[in-house]
Amino acid sequence: MDLLLLEKTLIGLFFAIIIAIVVSKLRSKKFKLPPGPIPVPVFGNWLQVGDDLNHRNLTEYAKKFGDLFLLRMGQRNLVVVSSPELAKEVLHTQGVEFGSRTRNVVFDIFTGKGQDMVFTVYGEHWRKMRRIMTVPFFTNKVVQQYRGGWEDEVAHVIDDVKKMPESATNGIVLRKRLQLMMYNNMYRIMFDRRFESEDDPLFNKLKALNGERSRLAQSFEYNYGDFIPILRPFLRGYLKICKEVKQRRLQLFKDYFVDERKKLSTTTKSMDNNALKCAIDHILEAEQKGEINEDNVLYIVENINVAAIETTLWSIEWGIAELVNHPEIQKKLRDEIDSVLGPGVQITEPHTHKLPYLQAVIKETLRLRMAIPLLVPHMNLHDAKLAGYDIPAESKILVNAWWLANNPATWKRPEEFRPERFFEEEKHVEANGNDFRYLPFGVGRRSCPGIILALPILGITLGRLVQNFELLPPPGQSKLDTTEKGGQFSLHILKHFTIVMKPRSF
């Protein structure tokens, strides 16, 4: 059976090469394409570039081919933007033309071919989903409604750490406890639910399935089948696993959270106009009105599990690592907190706006260790123009936001973790995209609306950890290992580090 499949694939590949040569010649007469390495039929630049399209590799290509270049990855066109001016063109000036989302074989599975909000094409469905999600998730009212819960969650983290004697001597892997905190932060908003401990069976099941989804979707190993359809039969096993994980996750969301909330709302009769609604109540109302269907509801839950929880957790983890590796910055932050609030006065969300050095630490973390360094890929549904070049329809557009924020031509000593830059030469720069050199959350129509949740959670969490503990590397180490691990468009730390947390006395 395998030999028969191989034979059919090779025959198909032969004919595909012939067709690709003809099509390539026809298309080359039509388009003035951006520069890039010379492609070969069928494979394009895939054999030269490989699967690992991370931000650092793409930066090297930008240095060679310029701020706008094209990679032909099999049958897909990949356009990479590496300057603030071109980023403004793609994300703002021509935001409608480039406002769609690219598709691939794995994300089609996990999003039901774009039934969600984050990965759907630009159009009526996206506008409807964005509107439905904004009120329950992405307003200052939501921040004020749930900030007390976020403050409680980090207080639980601090109490739990203080109960672990090893945390002050040999150290602990804090990420595990912070992961529980982030799930509780988001599940309070979504379902008015929280998990009591890391040992909660439902929490562990949820965490395992979300982790498997992230691993499968962020892996580069399926690129060959996505780029070159004739090779897709070799992905059957991989795609089968993706479908199984997708089905198990959606069933878990439905059985344990969505349906449970439906039962609660119909049996208690407490969901009147005066009662506080959680996010799923608003979303279920939209379903009842016929604006969305049950699948859309589940894919909204899927988006929050992926886009809100893990990305914020990665940024917290990076922030801690940089503070441990720069004790002078950690001390300066602690001194600011003690001076402004008074020793032992625990940070709340309103306090974070009175702590400029804390804000600078957050901005510097997001600059140097951008969680989504290439942003979520964009796509033009129709043929478009960019910088005088033709961009064929359905090209995948990557904005190398990490390079925009780390280019030594436009940033002073960008390789250094230096929050002071946001008091000095970059004092006007904010995380909301007011400067196209710095776009940790993107900008424009498809920017990340989660910025309104992420920034206060980062401030509360990093602030309370620093004011309650001295954060140190484990015995025998002078610094933490900050080796990066990239994915399809993610950037997190390779090894979940151990840190020593010495409680402070007030």
Swiss-Prot record:
GO terms for cellular component: nucleus. InterPro entries: Cyt_P450 (IPR001128), Cyt_P450_CS (IPR017972), Cyt_P450_E_grp-I (IPR002401), Cyt_P450_sf (IPR036396). A motif (Nuclear localization signal 1) lies at residues 161-168. It comes from the Eukaryota. Its cofactor is heme. Its EC number is 1.14.14.91. It catalyses: (E)-cinnamate + reduced [NADPH--hemoprotein reductase] + O2 = (E)-4-coumarate + oxidized [NADPH--hemoprotein reductase] + H2O + H(+). Signal peptide: none annotated. One of its GO terms (biological process) is lignin metabolic process. Transmembrane segments: none annotated. Induction: Repressed by MYB4. Heme binds at C448. Component of the floral volatile benzenoid/phenylpropanoid (FVBP) biosynthetic pathway that controls carbon flux to pigments essential for pollination or UV protection, to numerous pytoalexins synthesized by plants when challenged by pathogens, and to lignins. This is Trans-cinnamate 4-monooxygenase C4H1.
